């Protein structure tokens, strides 16, 4: 996984589609969903870490733009 789109496609494999309309909220919900999948041991550590890193980076970029 290298992009937010790839994370969305990854989550879709588990039946999760997230769209609220607020990009930051969408990313935060994706992060929460990934945590749930990881804690349920449905995804591997590497996938979890990579996805969380990408999401947090994107959230930071969006928050910096809003400031």
Name each model feature, range by range.
Residues 1-8, 56-67:
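Charged low-complexity stretches with an acidic bias
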Residues 1-24:
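N-terminal acidic leader/helix
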Residues 11, 40-45, 66-67:
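Short, structured secondary-structure boundary patches
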Residues 15-18, 38, 63:
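Short amphipathic alpha-helical interaction patches enriched in hydrophobic/aromatic residues
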Residues 21-23, 29, 66:
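Intrinsically disordered, low-complexity segments enriched in polar/charged residues with Gly/Pro
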Residues 26-61:
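Short, charge-rich amphipathic interface segments used for partner binding and complex assembly
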